[in-house]
Amino acid sequence: QMDTLRKAVTLGSIVKSPNYYENRPGILKGQGDVDDFMDTYAQVSGPEKLQSIYAFISLIASLGISALAGMLHGANMAVQILSTSLLVAVPASYFVSLTRPAALLERRLHMVGSVICGWQGVKKLCGKAVVPLRDEDMFPEGTTKLNGVKFYGTRTPDEIASVTASLIEEAGGGLVNVFRTLLTRREGELLPVEDFRNYGVGGIGGIIRGDPVLLGTLDFMQDMGVSVPDGTMVNQAVYAAIDGELCAVVAISYAKMRSSAAGLVSLIASKRLTPLMLTRDFMLTESFLGSKFSVKTRRMVFPDQETRDALSAVTADPEADVLAMTTRQDLASTVYCITGSGALRSACLLGNAIHIVGGVLGLLIMLAVAYLGSAQLLTPINILLYQLVWM
């Protein structure tokens, strides 16, 4: 973990915001500080405290059982019972039942540049929550590129470039840089947009220079009554219409990043987490994301544009407990912290439960042996076999 932070160029934090969406907490990203990690680094976890308490209780129980054996069968029997009770009361693998899962998770998080802020972070990252996803989470900067453009109608390419870029600039999102590139190539200029509207179904619209302008997917244009010739039907493209007439088809290339795909798959696979889409790019529809990332989108929430704008304005509380830290901006760095925390907590609690049951059962067996005086059962092979059963 320290090595991960040492190599960090940028440092982000992961915090939990209560009542973020429909009375459910949201997991937000903010600015991180190394002190947030150091404050929790050496704190003793709940499972470690339980392990220490059980070790003390098992020591007292072993002494009591050996005292009983001494009273019934003499000092030699008491020594045998004490030494064996200490072995079976705490199965050998109990000492790595907490550290081994933590080490495996730390190694995995190191690969994506993330650390969890102690057991506090593990515990608070568990439970049901919504995870807001933005344009840069799905398609980081540089992965969305212009793949060609074809103009239609009587309007000039320079005018079309200015109109489309202006509307995209008003909408925001991952397509802004793409249309800025188109605008620069055509030496156009940004124009004021009136009555901007995000339809929330794969398209946007507005009034520019008195003309109604629509930008959207093929399905959106057809739903809006814009005539689209058969030869222009491209799935991954932005269609532009001015005054109800198709004027351009801008082909867009979306490169699928491995980190984004891995993060989204891991997020959807977790039943306690709900992906909340706050993207501004109207191309990122439910069907497009499902096809692009090969995932089932029924658990993804696509709120209306008003809700998206309101939630996008919510920032991480600087006074909130920092639960994890990331040194990268990709989706996997954040999601692996959240899903890994749940897996680690389950593994630690299950490991504690199994080994405590094994230890208590071992003490009960030793109590019976001490009472009956059956010292012949306390052979190295029998003790080894018992240890192996609980590993």
Where are these regions (language model features)?
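Hydrophobic alpha-helical transmembrane segments
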Residues: 1-130, 325-391
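Cytosolic catalytic regions of ATP/NTP-dependent phosphoryl-transfer enzymes
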Residues: 13-28, 130-224, 242
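Conserved ATP-binding TGD loop and adjacent catalytic N/P-domain core of P-type ATPases
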Residues: 18-27, 208-210, 242-381
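Short beta-alpha junctions and helix-cap segments that line functional grooves
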Residues: 117-119, 192-193, 263
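Short, small/polar residue-rich loop motifs at catalytic or cofactor-binding pockets
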Residues: 125-128, 200, 232-234
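Residues within well-ordered alpha-helices
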Residues: 179, 217, 236, 263-264
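A short, polar/proline- and glycine-enriched secondary-structure boundary/capping micro-motif
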Residues: 223-227, 259-261
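Helix-loop-beta junctions that constitute the ligand-sensing/allosteric loops
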Residues: 230-239, 272-273
